[in-house]
């Protein structure tokens, strides 16, 4: 369906008015399976090269899709793969035009949601715990020394998940958010569960604050917006 819609958009709205030169990458599930998902990586690298892309909706397979499409494996989300390569930020901005009325009538200004697009659940490692036993986080330094943290001492079957992120990616995320707020003249609100996640989420909070204080505080004051 997305192929049909994109073709209609190009044929009716774009090609009659502009000389559109594009590279096309088929991210349909069957073709991703045929190429061992290499086509998704190729599409991401092309996006990085040209600085712009239009991506249509894709299927991220679950167990039922594995059987339906006879897949080699349960391929990861194309969005997650592309975002990780681009180290990008997802901005969900509302459509604000006459004729489209907001659900909350007294909201006159747009609310944009910014989400970090690297790591977290998109690059996680999961396992099903078959029975009693310990799940641990282990960090092995280059010199071979190890640091261990107990995740949970299971008394029966369950599930476990490990996630990661990078300081430089969080810094890039912070700058994207601050620059977007300045460009659109929107106040920026930061939300995380740092009171519970005192290392993972708190690192996001600390990095945002450090960058804001060092590089953006005066710019925000001049623009009349707040963080």
Predicted regions and their residues:
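Glycine-rich phosphate/diphosphate-binding loop of Rossmann-like nucleotide-binding domains
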Residues: 1-8, 12-15, 137-227
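N-terminal glycine-rich phosphate/adenylate-binding segment common to multiple enzyme folds
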Residues: 31-142, 146
